[in-house]
Amino acid sequence: MIKRDIEAKIRSDFGKGKVVLVLGARQVGKTTLLNQLAENVERVLRINCDNADERERLSNPNTTQLLNMVGNAQLVLIDEAQRIPDVGMVLKMLADALGARAQIVATGSSALELANGVFESAAGRIFEYRLYPLSHGELAAQSGAERTEQRLLQERLVYGSYPEVVTAPNDGRRILESIASGALYKDVLSFGGIRKPDVLSRLVQCLALQLGSEVSANELGQMTGLNKATVESYIDLLEKTFVVFSLRSFARNARNELKRARKIYFWDNGIRNVVLGNFAPLTLRTDVGALWENWLVSERLKRLAYAQSYARSYFWRTTTQSEIDYIEELDGQIKAFEFKWNPHEKAKMPQPFAAAYPNATYSVISRESYDGFLM
């Protein structure tokens, strides 16, 4: 069983009288994480809110009912908590009633209803974590696995790192097809009020095709037949269900910097490729640069999240097409990174960026130098 980076951090939050909330896409390993957290705990109460009967136990309860349900449990595990009506109030009631006597851990695959409802009703009672598909660091940390991960790099760029894909690589495509046809959009369709799933699928395909490029809501609207506001709404839903994420353009000084541009990336390369139905090896692909960029950016953001870093992430581009793939800013320090799949391809800091940010650092990340960037 692959150990998740956030497990130890979650355990360190036990006994503080707070609800631990773990958000992440379906099938990234949240239930497995709950099982790991339950190891060596004598009295555990498990509630799976995908099950209607179990969900009913948390529908409009009073404090006495909650205390009777918990009984003498030391650990209360609530899976897929976003399906509980008024989930924030329920978690608040549990936290207030139990205090540090029992630890509550709730998971959810959607930030749509869960995070918003929780933070409105249970302010000050939540420690939040995000769980993503397996990270490069988690995979490389397995005993003797670092060289194995280097050898499997091309496979990761094509098939990604959902746990089941990693543990059953021969079935990778079939597993990803199953995720894409079922779990991927389940929460978007449930909570987003979307009546035309085919239009949503078309939008995701358009985002997949524009990987590594700036996206325009107007252009996406023309490609899908949606208006700009609906495109923006759907992208927001996809971000809140952990299918994609955005990077905004970095701009501080120069007049010609793009100030409102953004790129859309996928949290998992395999999901991006299954959306397009393309699992060709890298040697037969024309999108290697985009896959490399998506993998590095998503893996870097996983690392920052698990390290609980406050660094902010961007890309940089000017109206004259000078560009840098990835920018990080923390406490006034700016780090710039350029991504090159070919380790022999040269790159240097663009002169306009160097002039505008003379104290910034600049690094080139290739397939021979990425470990330090991700671990």
Locate the predicted segments by residue.
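A cross-kingdom feature that marks ATP-driven nucleic-acid transaction machinery
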Residues: 3, 12-25, 31, 36-43, ...
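Conserved catalytic/switch belt of AAA+ P-loop NTPases
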Residues: 88-112, 119-120
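Short regulatory helix/loop adjacent to the ATP-binding pocket of P-loop NTPases
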Residues: 112-128, 143-144
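Conserved P-loop NTPase "ATPase switch" module shared by AAA+ and STAND
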Residues: 70-87
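Conserved Walker B
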Residues: 50, 80-84, 110
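Conserved ATPase-coupling elements of RecA-like P-loop NTPase cores
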Residues: 56-57, 82-91, 116-117
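Interdomain hinge/linker elements that couple catalytic modules in large macromolecular machines
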Residues: 132-306, 318-319
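Short glycine-rich substrate-engagement loop in P-loop NTPases that contacts/grips substrate
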Residues: 45-72
